[in-house]
Amino acid sequence: MTELKSKGPRAPHVAGGPPSPEVGSPLLCRPAAGPFQGSQTSDTLPEVSAIPISLDGLLFPRLCQGQDPPDKKTQNQQSLSDVEGAYSRAEATRGTGGSSSRPPEKDSGLLDSVLDTLLAPSGPGQSQPSPPACEVTSSWCLFGPELPEDPPAAPATQRVLSPLMSRSGGKTEDSSGTAAAHKVLPRGLSPSRQLLLPTSGSPHWSGAPVKPSPQPTAVEVEEEDGSESEDSAGPLLKGKSRVLGGAAAGGGAAAVPPGAAAGGVGLVPKEDSRFSAPRVALVEQDAPMAPGRSPLATTMMDFIHVPIVPLNHALLAARTRQLLEDESYDGGAGAASAFAPPQSSPSASSTPVAVGDFPDCAYPPDAEPKDNAYPLYGDFQPLALKIKEEEEGAEASARSPGSYLVAGANPAAFPDFPLGPPPQLPPRAPPSRPGEAAVTAAPASASVSSASSPGSTLECILYKAEGALPQQGQFAPPPCKAPGAGGCLLPRDGLPSTSASAAAAAGAAPTLYPALGLNGLPQLGYQAAVLKEGLQQVYPPYLNYLRPDSEASQSPQYSFESLPQKICLICGDEASGCHYGVLTCGSCKVFFKRAMEGQHNYLCAGRNDCIVDKIRRKNCPACRLRKCCQAGMVLGGRKFKKFNKVRVMRALDAVALPQPVGIPNESQVLSQRFTFSPGQDIQLIPPLIKLLMSIEPDVIYAGHDNSKPDTSSSLLTSLNQLGERQLLSVVKWSKSLPGFRNLHIDDQITLIQYSWMSLMVFGLGWRSYKHVSGQMLYFAPDLILNEQRMKESSFYSLCLTMWQIPQEFVKLQVSQEEFLCMKVLLLLNTIPLEGLRSQTQFEEMRSSYIRELIKAIGLRQKGVVSSSQRFYQLTKLLDNLHDLVKQLHLYCLNTFIQSRALSVEFPEMMSEVIAAQLPKILAGMVKPLLFHKK
């Protein structure tokens, strides 16, 4: 007959008296030999937790006398305990028959009714019914002898259970539930693998961080007849809840029945599954092994309490959207490939796990969450400015610019799972960090991956996919020519480079730039058969840029031979010929001649965006003249009559001719083009500068309402809207900049973030210099501030600071070629203190544009002395811009911080750049590159 022994300050139990209501009292039974009781003698009695018996309605285990009742059901289960070859196999047999509840007996035999059925380990290969509880007293080793810090002589049971059982009476509510939970141990695990999360009072094992105390658990109880549930298979036991611990809040507290003591084992109805939200249940029955998972993975996943990280509403909405948009999400091949187990797992060759199971969200054995546990939902960090690599191929055009999630379940959605073979892509610049080659070779549909975290609006705009036409070479996709489709434009990324990274791709023919049309109209074509014959030895990589006459009809550009209809590029009427360098009608020809010779000062009554067509071309002469100038009409174009037809076409199509991406050297003279300006003779423009002219952004409007009186908030809001549009323009311009895409992606991000303010104020100075001769600040055609409006604004001192730039342009008489080269150098004028990842490529690119600036100076300055003086003046202006822009950064950051009080709106992408980079710049965490010492 076993006795109930008191422990610590508790009162001793009197035989024959009522049972002690203390929870956690030790039960002393006859010891039994076990594999985990190496140094435990027969006199040492294990301690186990007791079930509180002071309340009615609790589940009592079977009596310890005699054999099992005939109506009870015994279940046996084998599990593997051979973990990493360190331990031998062991079988655990436990009777888990459902015991019906009955009221407690009021006699001395009541003690027998509270004894639990303990697991009696047997030899391998044996399976027998469980003996009575009074005969099996082998204790459970919670953590097993595998703890390295435990001395081998001390039993693991005593070291682990003693701190769990030595609780003060005042903490019964917190410890009773944990002690009761230790009574119901997971079946299918060997004692050495029964890893239970430590409570707040238990010591942690080595290497495991401290975690909050687990929630109380309620143990699932079968029906009285002991029948098993038919749908109980699976690793997640269909939401059966458990509660571990004392005062549980929320659904955990509701799961405990009223009649159960605090921390006791309560009954939870099987149909009430609403309490099972994020927890894994423990069941008193055998759980079948989940398909596609090994026994070890199943047991470890089913019975370890996993604190799943809660997902916010945005992540849940993204997951729902991904499931809804997946067309193949019906358990077919799409679902099988998306949820395939890892190749390194023991069950890689088994059936895929169920869709509802998320094994990658669990903590690994070292209790640390995986870095890529939630690959589909993006980063939990604040939005960072990341630039993704642009997808290649025609299928990238179907991707939405604003989508950050893959539209369906694909093998790349979960980076832990095996990825399908990626398609071959054209070679790109080699990454400077190891392990990034696989990221750049990811398929177009896998834009969201663990190596490239999701980014912001700037990321989506910077390298969004463009419609791509097939390339000529081994990476060429199928042809995409369609009848009446015009022509296909190829991305700029396909252009060759003279750098070492592009030398390997010289065998594949390069692609073309998109036609840089004006006002949406294509440029004129040209005949290049003669020029192509002369470039056989000089430009072998660039021969596909030059089209023979036979290809003129297939080109989307116009040419005189294959022009289906001669259309005026100004008004759309039938063109009578090439007048002043542009294919126009007779009306626009006469209008342009009279307007330029008469020096009329036309003003638009609208917003400088009037429609100029055949019917309305006479409504607004200002917009008509502006369109003529934008199309390239110049009075000097009459000198074309002195040349033959081939040279005329070459000169007219200079902008439309694609230029090499690589920086040309001095020997590349054949690719130079002729340009003309009024009052000047023909001059040669270096090809790179000519390319910079062709990629210059169009006119950007601020959208300011000039009909209303100016207020501080309205002016600042309009300037912010203009800054957002100009930032987008800077991003697109940098994409087309030769040599910029050879830099590392992070370097491209950094350079844009550090220089966007300098580029904007430099463009403001150029527009003010060209349009109003530096007398006003020409922010946009619809936002021009004269001195009176500057004084009325709240940022008059800032306007005076910005006004210095156009005044310097007027003083130095800066040419357009010089301005374009200086603008690129501004982009490359500020780097981080630690340098860039592709520092070598950056220095080569910067040196090349410095040489281009010297060439631009040589177009106007003759002589070494004058050219050197001019170079000093222009570079000194670039150095002085650092201090000027710093004042703009400080004012912009202060306005951004007080934007709510000032009623000033900041657009999204501009806000991201200001919040992420301006504090670093103002704190001196950047390194300005100066031409001259101060």
UniProtKB/Swiss-Prot annotation:
It comes from the Eukaryota. One of its GO terms (molecular function) is nuclear steroid receptor activity. There is a cross-link at residues 388, 532 (Glycyl lysine isopeptide (Lys-Gly) (interchain with G-Cter in SUMO)). InterPro entries: NHR-like_dom_sf (IPR035500), Nucl_hrmn_rcpt_lig-bd (IPR000536), Nuclear_hormone_rcpt_NR3 (IPR050200), Nuclear_hrmn_rcpt (IPR001723), Progest_rcpt (IPR000128), Znf_hrmn_rcpt (IPR001628), Znf_NHR/GATA (IPR013088). It is found in: Nucleus; Cytoplasm. Progesterone binds at residue 767. Residues 1-164 are annotated as: AF3. Keywords: Cytoplasm, DNA-binding, Isopeptide bond, Lipid-binding, Lipoprotein, Metal-binding, Nucleus, Palmitate, Phosphoprotein, Receptor, Steroid-binding, Transcription, Transcription regulation, Ubl conjugation, Zinc, Zinc-finger. A motif (LXXL motif 1) lies at residues 55-59. A zinc finger (NR C4-type) spans 568-588, 604-628. A motif (Nuclear localization signal) lies at residues 183-187. Interacts with SMARD1 and UNC45A. Interacts with CUEDC2; the interaction promotes ubiquitination, decreases sumoylation, and represses transcriptional activity. Interacts with PIAS3; the interaction promotes sumoylation of PR in a hormone-dependent manner, inhibits DNA-binding, and alters nuclear export. Interacts with SP1; the interaction requires ligand-induced phosphorylation on Ser-345 by ERK1/2-MAPK. Interacts with PRMT2. Interacts with NCOA2 and NCOA1. Interacts with KLF9. Interacts with GTF2B. PANTHER family: KNIRPS-RELATED PROTEIN-RELATED (PTHR48092). The steroid hormones and their receptors are involved in the regulation of eukaryotic gene expression and affect cellular proliferation and differentiation in target tissues. Transcriptional activator of several progesteron-dependent promoters in a variety of cell types. Involved in activation of SRC-dependent MAPK signaling on hormone stimulation. This is Progesterone receptor. It comes from Colobus guereza.
